[in-house]
């Protein structure tokens, strides 16, 4: 009888520990999620930089198109595997022409976003990549007001002014070091605008795919496969690919496919990090990751930067971090007294409408 009671007690303790994980288990989950986000995000930027600048293939749109192809394949494959074997959960991926047409306006913005992101990375160094696209927050505020009619607090606008100052200082100091590419800066500004528009239009069309971000990812990339074809033709990339001397090189295709896998995984690890922490912590992690990425790039490429160049990076990072903090306070104030379900919904909308980090880093 005593042994039976001890067994029941042990079973109860095991069930309670499973339902209420210890602090250490929670810490492990957070550390693993944040580490995965950093590894895939930083790895994707360096890998794309290599593909865009070091393999002697002048076809940035083709590289982006292929990564979209990998994403579509992975979405369909995981959906079929999930349905057939039930080893994990992944949403169904029905290919519907009606849904594809409804998502098309967003897909046009999506194609512009991933194209300008990669074109910016092609012409600027990894160390300047974050500053080069740092106006996303500013465009997000402007577009939210012009398109949705939503006003932003004076404190948030002050943070945007700080970001603009840091961006201009960064451009100036990049010129001082002799590594400034005006083409790259222009593509960076256009990428920032596209990311802001992408976040807004994502909210508008999300209901068309049943509020499923994975399904939206599949349709966006599926539409992109078609939209990229005339762009590649106009840019003369079919000939560049056909005459590429490493076209049948296994290593090249492994790296290309790995870039697509990393881009796909960014969607998962971003959601995982948010789930393990919070939208605010996710944004702070993204800002810290950008700082680490900048330092790593300077060391990896043996670059020499001025004190003012580093100051520009700090100003942009500080402005972005303060903007996140200010917006979080605004959301907390709005959510005070609201139900937990309403708070969760607000956090989701805030995530979609913020800087679009997930989207811009997934390419």
UniProtKB/Swiss-Prot annotation:
GO molecular function annotations of the record: antiporter activity; GDP-fucose transmembrane transporter activity
Record key words, sorted: Golgi apparatus, Membrane, Sugar transport, Transmembrane, Transmembrane helix, Transport
The keyword Cell inner membrane appears for this protein: no
Membrane topology: Multi-pass membrane protein
InterPro entries associated with the record: Sugar_P_trans_dom, TPT_transporter
A GO BP entry: GDP-fucose import into Golgi lumen
Function: Involved in GDP-fucose import from the cytoplasm into the Golgi lumen.
Protein name, entry field: GDP-fucose transporter
Species assigned in the record: Caenorhabditis elegans
């Amino acid at each position: 009888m005593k042994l039976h009671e001890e067994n029941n007690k042990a079973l109860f303790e095991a069930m309670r520990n499973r339902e209420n994980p210890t602090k250490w288990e929670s810490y492990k989950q957070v550390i693993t999620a944040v580490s995965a986000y950093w590894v895939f995000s930083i790895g994707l930027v360096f890998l794309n930089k290599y593909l865009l600048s070091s393999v002697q293939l002048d076809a940035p749109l083709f590289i982006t198109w292929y990564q979209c192809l990998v994403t579509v394949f992975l979405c369909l494959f995981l959906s079929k595997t999930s349905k057939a074997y039930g080893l994990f959960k992944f949403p169904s991926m029905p290919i519907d022409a009606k849904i594809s047409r409804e998502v098309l306006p967003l897909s046009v913005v999506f194609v512009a976003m991933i194209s300008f992101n990669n074109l910016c990375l092609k012409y600027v160094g990894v160390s300047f990549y974050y500053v080069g696209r740092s106006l996303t927050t500013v465009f997000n505020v402007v577009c939210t007001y012009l398109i949705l009619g939503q006003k932003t607090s004076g404190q948030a606008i002050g943070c945007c002014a700080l970001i603009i100052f840091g961006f201009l200082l960064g451009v100036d100091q990049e010129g001082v070091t002799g590594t400034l590419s005006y083409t790259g800066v222009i593509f960076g500004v256009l990428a920032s605008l596209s990311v802001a528009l992408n976040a807004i239009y994502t909210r508008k069309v999300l209901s068309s795919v049943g509020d499923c971000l994975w399904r939206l990812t599949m349709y966006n990339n599926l539409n992109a496969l078609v939209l990229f074809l005339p762009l590649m033709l106009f840019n003369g990339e079919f000939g560049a690919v056909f005459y590429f001397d490493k076209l049948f090189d296994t290593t090249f295709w492994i790296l290309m496919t790995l870039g697509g896998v990393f881009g796909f995984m960014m969607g998962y690890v971003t959601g995982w990090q948010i789930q393990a922490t919070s939208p605010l912590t996710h944004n702070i992690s993204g800002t810290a990751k950008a700082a680490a990425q900048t330092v790593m790039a300077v060391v990896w490429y043996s670059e020499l930067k001025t004190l003012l160049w580093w100051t520009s990076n700090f100003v942009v990072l500080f402005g972005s971090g303060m903007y996140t903090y200010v917006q979080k306070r605004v959301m907390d104030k709005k959510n005070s007294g609201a139900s937990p379900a309403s708070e969760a919904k607000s956090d989701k909308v805030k995530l979609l409408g913020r800087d679009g980090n997930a989207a811009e880093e997934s390419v």
